[in-house]
Curated annotation (Swiss-Prot):
It comes from the Bacteria. The keyword Metal-binding does not apply. Coiled coil: none annotated. This is Uncharacterized membrane protein YwcD. GO terms for biological process: polysaccharide biosynthetic process. Keywords: Cell membrane, Membrane, Transmembrane, Transmembrane helix. It is a multi-pass membrane protein. Pfam families: GtrA_DPMS_TM. Belongs to the GtrA family. It comes from Bacillus subtilis (strain 168). One of its GO terms (cellular component) is plasma membrane. Its main location: membrane. The chain crosses the membrane at residues 1-21, 32-52, 68-88, 100-120.
Amino acid sequence: MYIIMGVFTTIVNIASFYILVEIMNVDYKAATVAAWILSVLFAYITNKLYVFQQKTHDLQSLLKELTAFFSVRVLSLGIDLGMMIILVGQFNTNETLAKILDNAVIVVVNYVASKWLVFKKTKEEGV
């Protein structure tokens, strides 16, 4: 299920980036950050509901989980933006192609971080 939701999240990221850069003429760095925000929101919802099937029973737990998810994903933003600056800024790679390449790395980083840091099961949940 993670792969399916990861594909959808990647599509959200690349499509929003493409629209911002190619249609709205937004700078690729700003578009990278905006696409990251949209895709992280999408990823949180789909990971919570469909991948890790986490149930949150109170607002405090939800906010803690959401904060952890976004905090961990800041690492992916750094990787995303860094790769875009290197690929586009240094190697003159097409912006959309660079976004596709960097998403391949981001999917792996995000899965590991989500599984082990955000949606980890506690002893009470059977682990």
